[in-house]
Amino acid sequence: MAAKQVIFGDDARAKIVNGVNILANAVKVTLGPKGRNVVLERSFGSPTVTKDGVSVAKEIELSDKLENMGAQLVKEVASKTNDNAGDGTTTATVLAQAIVREGFKYVAAGFNPTDLKRGIDKAVAEIVNEIKAIAKPTTTSKEIAQVGSISANSDADIGQIIADAMDKVGKEGVITVEDGSGLQNELDVVEGMQFDRGYLSPYFINNPERQIALLENPFVLLYDKKISNIRDLLPTLEQVAKAGRPLLIIAEDVEGEALATLVVNNIRGILKAVAVKAPGFGDRRKAMLEDIAILTGGTVIAEEVGLSLEKVTLENLGQAKRVEIGKENTTIIDGAGSENNIKVRIDQIKKQIEDATSDYDREKLQERVAKLAGGVAVIKVGAATETEMKEKKARVEDALHATRAAVEEGIVPGGGVALLRARSSIKELKGDNPDQDAGIKIVLRAIEEPLRQIVANAGDEPSVVVNKVLEGTGNYGYNASNGTYGDLVELGVLDPAKVTRSALQNAASVASLILTTDALVAELPKEEAAPAMPDAGGMGGMGF
């Protein structure tokens, strides 16, 4: 085991504060509408230009192992806030730096770090409750657009396109972000439920222009095994043919004689039927078939529920207004399932999302919710160069997370004002002893810091602006994009309550740990061995 260096007390604190400051100073220049860019080196290709706090934080690794510990702890603040709320990473970093800075002043003056931590925790809990109390729900598309714009560094186009996407697919719908091919941002919306399986034979195509099979008002047969024998299918086909409607068959596979018969019937116009493979694999396939059954008001034909293909009646089949089947995708539009059953299914999947342990499972479950809820929107980000595309795409993703957070827990006035207004809830707060009171004072000062940094980045005097904002009440604050004061909610300067709350909680959590640290242990730097002397051989011809 390599030898370690151990340092204590003031020396340890000085090192950790240096690390915190290096990382926080690099991140905080990006805060606010007039925040600056940070350029990140890449091992290959062009450098990345970003205004995203967590992207900057993730790149920082310091050569001094002791200072690096401080930097990594603050990096954790940004990452955790990003995971919880999807935005607010720079605010969280600024708050953590302020709590560490103010806290160490008290530690140096002889206050007990553990009691300081308890005071900080007490104050933060009160402020979080106050933020929840002043938050108001997002009701209009305009508010969603404003939240998105602020998060995307005051880019109104991005805010608007996200609001449009949410209008189209609903607040539960899936919105994905992809690289566009032009200079402008574009929005593509897929209505209904789409899954990534297409027709099993090109002979099913009945719309040559779009190269799709289009079924109007079809029945939907859902089967969890392979179909290869046409005899199994005949009872169903006869009933559907009598009803004079088309049929969509979704099964593990349709092959051989069964597929050939369907194709021949389709070409001859006897029965319009299209076969596709069921989406997913294993247990996920069963779950998705069940989703489609609930959406279309049908039943999955499976031995487990005592149903076989020969015994299928029209009551067992699902129905939809329209189905479009392409080479790679199938879209079911306006299924005949009951609203109540769909809602119950969505709630059930949401419960599974809460219990999911892996990001992959969570993502797949969220996709299923969106497909049941009614659609998927794709935002295609346009830009002139690849570097600009990456930067813009990161901002769109941030804005998307922020708008989701706003829908979840509501909105508060932005520009650091919500935290300032929440001060009133802890002004009279008392701890169990003077050291805890000092912890409360640390938070009182630290929550001014986001506004101070926004103002500093905009080139104004922080103390003057903070005092002027404190003279006002309610939503009165400073709009850094044009240097004016007014009602920030009316001006459209909004933050999601969840982002503000998460930023403070995560900052206080890590900063408190740093304050109560009194020793650092790290590997000693390896001493570089002196380079070997070059070989002196082959020096003949010297005349000795």
Curated annotation (Swiss-Prot):
Residues that bind ATP: 30-33, 51, 87-91, 415, 495
GO CC annotations on file: cytoplasm
Highest taxon listed in the record's lineage: Bacteria
Record keyword ATP-binding present: yes
Entry EC no(s): 5.6.1.7
Any one Gene Ontology molecular-function term assigned to this protein's record: isomerase activity
Catalytic function, reaction form: ATP + H2O + a folded polypeptide = ADP + phosphate + an unfolded polypeptide
PROSITE patterns: CHAPERONINS_CPN60
Record NCBIfam families: GroEL, PRK00013.1, PRK12849.1, PRK12850.1, PRK12851.1
Function noted in UniProt: Together with its co-chaperonin GroES, plays an essential role in assisting protein folding. The GroEL-GroES system forms a nano-cage that allows encapsulation of the non-native substrate proteins and provides a physical environment optimized to promote and accelerate protein folding.
SUBUNIT field: Forms a cylinder of 14 subunits composed of two heptameric rings stacked back-to-back. Interacts with the co-chaperonin GroES.
Family from the record: Belongs to the chaperonin (HSP60) family.
Protein name in UniProt: Chaperonin GroEL
Organism, as annotated: Methylobacillus flagellatus (strain ATCC 51484 / DSM 6875 / VKM B-1610 / KT)
Classification lineage: Bacteria, Pseudomonadati, Pseudomonadota, Betaproteobacteria, Nitrosomonadales
